[in-house]
Amino acid sequence: MSGSAQWRPMGQGDVDAAAAISDRVHGAYTEKPAIYAERLRLYPAGCFLLERDGQVLGYLVTHPWAGDRPPALDQLIGAMPDTPDRYYLHDLALLPEARGTGAAAAAVDLAVELARTAGFDRITLTAVNGADVFWRRQGFVDAPVAADSYGADSVSMVRVL
């Protein structure tokens, strides 16, 4: 692999690749391919793949959301909220070979740009598998919201823009 990895828009043909990465990276927190397909259908502007020399190395899924409670893990949402009040970073996953390359920070920058462009003043997320340490380095702080479907070790977080 000689080129640098780049974030590009996700297409419906990329859903299985995103789901396979989720299976590899997230363990118990993985989601069905239908979840990624739905988020892409509902808000394609917020879905991206990290690719280098034709190999998919990661994905980013973001979308508008309303209210303090995040979308439930591995559940379809049906539609974007009519009156969203925040931008939700649903998932950022990188294969091990893409970690430490700056790709995750670039994904956060992309999410911040998308949120600001859409007029939101904050991004929320649910950190799992100890990822709260990474998210704090990206300017997120703990939020006092229970993300029930994500388990007791999950951490709800927010970044004010």
Where are these regions (language model features)?
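Conserved GNAT acetyl-CoA-binding A-motif
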Residues: 108, 113-128
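Glycine-rich phosphate/pyrophosphate-binding loop shared by adenosine-nucleotide-utilizing enzymes
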Residues: 5, 55-59, 87
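A short beta-loop-alpha structural element at the N-terminal edge
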Residues: 4-18
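Helix-loop element at the rim of GNAT/NAT acetyltransferase active sites that forms part
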Residues: 15, 19-33
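Conserved acyl-donor/pantetheine-binding loop and adjacent beta-alpha core of acyl/acetyltransferases
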Residues: 60-92, 99, 147-154
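Conserved acetyl-CoA-binding loop-helix of GNAT-fold acetyltransferases
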Residues: 94, 100-113
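Conserved active-site alpha-helix within GNAT-family acetyltransferase domains
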Residues: 105, 117, 128-153
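Active-site rim helix/loop that mediates acceptor-substrate recognition in acyltransferases
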Residues: 27-57, 61-79
